[in-house]
Amino acid sequence: MGVARHWFAALVGVDPATVATGAAVSQLLAPVAAAVPDGTRVLVPDVEFTSNVFPWAVHTDRGVTVRTAPVDRLADAIARDVDVVAFSAVQSATGEVADVAAISQAARDVGALSVMDTSQAIGWLPVDPNAADLQVCAAYKWLCSPRGTAFLVHHPALAERHPGITSRLRPLAAGWFAGEVPHESYYGPPLRLARDARRFDISPAWHCWVGAAPALQVLAATGAGAIGEHNVALADSFLTALDQPPSNSAIVSVPADDAAVARLTAAGVRFGVRAGRVRVAFHLYSTADDVDMAIGALRG
């Protein structure tokens, strides 16, 4: 697990001491959502994956509210009546890339906590590691890791920017693996949590992390910039073949009827269907032949 943490930190450009490991985005965000004060006002995009919505929404019993705005107008919607801004760097259904810099700066200007889900970005899109206060990522997407692997990055200035929240921020599932020296934390008390982000680690599903470490090493060695150029070039080739304008994303979404969906399935193309549109994505292992196969299936 330490090896996977190291390579993830190298890929993202952060200190490994700021990285907590877990099993899922919602699990890693749960302690953060539990730490916000009663009555906290949360702003999310109107189309946001629920792993970055439900952790906040379950606290409505203590006055926490969640409201929405379109992601392309999210920065403009951030005002003094917003306490937390939770958003994805890349939208999973459409591939829309958020204006991370503008959203993060707008949150900082009003003193709001910014929480960015990078599950659909890290691995192909270089993301400023200093943009958001917290960055959370499911590793089974673009990080090519087994399910059950995820990361949460705490900005080094988190405590300075948000002392109230950080004073209440504590693990909700502390166990031996959250100890300062895990193999000396089998029995207790007293409580002896790690002094860095490892205090939020949970006991790992070992086989998942055995698979994650080499995948992260390959991605870190290749670099998100180079991977992104490759991916977006293939995505644009796909769009051009369909007479669609180019994009800035490795994820594309196009209209498709039931017959086209059936042809894609028969051709062995891996894709998703969201709101009546076919979603395809291209990664470092994708080739021009893959683009041609998908286009051929769509056209029939």
Model-identified regions with their sequence ranges:
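Pyridoxal 5′-phosphate
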Residues: 1-300
